[in-house]
Amino acid sequence: LPKTEQIPSDFYRKGETVRAVVARVDNRNNNPKIILSRTSPMFLQRLLEMEVPEINDGLITVKKIARIPGERAKIAVESYDDRIDPVGACVGVKGSRIHGIVRELRNENIDVINYTANIQLFIQRALSPAHVSSLVMHEEEKKVEVYLKPEEVSLAIGKGGMNIKLASMLTEYTIDVYRELDEDAENEDIYLEEFEDEIDGWVIDAIKSLGLDTAKAVLNAPREMLIEKADLE
């Protein structure tokens, strides 16, 4: 069990029982060495199979797993029986099934979501607990622009960027997050005096002499007029 295959907070004493999954078998010079892993997504899947009978029985399948070992994980599950809620079955009553796995993984937070082949909906679910307002897909590039209300952006990104990183790993899409401006914000205007620290006073006076008092008025004014009348280029 190399250090690279251990959860960062793992600590073991000699003779202590370790739960892990076999990652690979190295056979060098006729000396086989079994390499174990606790950081592999497969380890989390095996723990789920042990804790959730419906997975072991084939009623629920684990479609995808993304992990930052010891920190956070996202799991996408699907049920083959309409009567079974796959997320509820994995979490258990009051979290009874998932809590044992969380403890085994050194308090790794685990989000369980419903899998769907609809990639737009899957991306929205992967970014939970944030609520997505709209998406712009670039399927050929495997990229997506996600628009959220300002108060939802930090939830989508997550602590240390973990939520968006895991969502990208789970969906296999590069996710760019943008703030969605409400209508009031879009309609707001700014008086030129508020730019005094960035723009020379004579420039502001020249623009105002044209009857342009706000930023939007300047943006909507013909470029030729600004150059000719206010001596701006």
PLM feature spans:
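RNA-contacting regions in translation and RNA-metabolism proteins
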Residues: L1-E233
